[in-house]
Amino acid sequence: MGIVINLFLIIFASVVFFAAGFFLGRFFLERLGTTKVLEAEERAVQIVQEAQKEANEYKELKVTEVNQEWKKKRREFDQEVVIKNNKFNQLQKQVQQREAQLKKQLQDVRDTERKLQDQQKELDQAMETVGIRATELERIITEQNQRLESISNLQADEARQMLVDNMITKAREEATETIHKIHEEAEENAGRLAEKTLLTAIQRISFEQATENALSVVHIQSDELKGRIIGREGRNIKAFENATGVDIIVDDTPEVVILSCFDPLRREHAKLTLKKLLADGVIHPVAIEKAYLDAGKEMADVIMSAGEEALASLQIPDMPAEIVRLIGTMKFHSVYGQNLLQHSREVAMLAGIMATELKLDPRLAKRAGLLHDIGLVLPDTDQPHALAASEFLRKFKESAVVLNAIAAHHGEAEKESPIAELVDAANVISLARPGARGAVTADGNVKRLESLEEIAKGFPGVLKTYALQAGREIRVIVEGDNVSDSQADVLAHDIAHKIESEAQYPGQIKVSIVRERRSVAYAK
């Protein structure tokens, strides 16, 4: 019995200890799991906080960069606004000054017109007086005939003829003097009117003159792009030059790449190609060839737009597409360092204004002025550009007045209309005025004047020669004993002809012969 009780106690104790161990183990396991969960949650919170901190720092960095970029753009914009405002104020001031000048010139022209009308009235009165005097002369002749018949044995016909001859001689002398005086007054008034017309035309237009060079500048976003433009071992530069025929210069100048070529059209094509490559961001030989082809299509649009813009600015309608394309091509050519299209527009505006002042058709004048140098962009022609342009435009049924003005503006054809004279004068003004011919240096001008004097010195009987008015007049002093008045006229013609054949000059040169003969005697 005692054994059974002990066995029971042992079993009971085992069960109790087992249960206690089970519950204690479960308690410790649950406690350990709760601790790990708390640690994981704390770690997660820490990670989130660190990520939030990094995000805030990154956000602050980007906000700072954006603010700096905005401030930079704002400064650039403010500077540009200031520059444009200054330029606008200058242009406004120039316009006001020119308006005042034009008002004064308009008043001068009106005064001149009134003077011409007064002179016309005086001339009409003079003609009326001449008619009255002629009637009086006939009456006097009749009376003299009657007197001669009564006091002389001469026949009436003989006496009448004698009187008529005397009176005709005297009348011719008086008429010659009157005509000479009227002619001088007309020349003087015409000179004043021509001067005012030219001044009005020149002052009513304004073109910025800039000498054309052989460089184009392309701005890039950063200097890092220069390495991509060069390519590995310079292969991209070689491919670009082979495709475009334009030299590309990559130097230390920040954010700038330079294109160099003597042909402005080719250089502009290359500039568009490079801009397309920079916009796409892909630069390699195949991409360069594709960009060059795409830029070629865009160049055709650029050329047509330039031609249409020139026609619109001059209000010239009805121009065939082929001619519009050639006009646009002139934008990418130069003459004496001056942009060819700008020069042609200037000639057109000058000719149009002068035609308006002289009551001629300004549309024909502007049309001829714009097209006068189109022969310089015609391909494969051996003719002088003026004649080549005239023949080319004849195919498009251009008016005869315009064709003659174009063909004659360099003296290779006879001028058949006043429009031709105006286009020639406008061309000379545009090329000869200061700032237009940037290629003509001071040293070149000195040599030109010296050559003109040497040409005149080579003729017999010449003592001295002087080039005056910047070469627009050559004054020649000759020996009075060896050169007569008639010989002086021939000498002036010969010198002018030799200058035309041997010298190059803008406009016309006046040759003046000065002949002086001195006779000396002494009273004793």
From Swiss-Prot:
The answer on whether this UniProt entry bears the keyword Cell membrane reads: yes
Q: Which domain of life is it from?
A: Bacteria
EC number(s) per entry: 3.1.-.-
For this protein, the parts annotated as crossing the membrane are 3-23
Chain ranges of the KH domain: 214-274
GO cellular component term of the entry, any? plasma membrane
The protein's job, in short, is:
Endoribonuclease that initiates mRNA decay.
List the protein's name.
Ribonuclease Y
**Species of provenance:** Chlorobium luteolum (strain DSM 273 / BCRC 81028 / 2530)
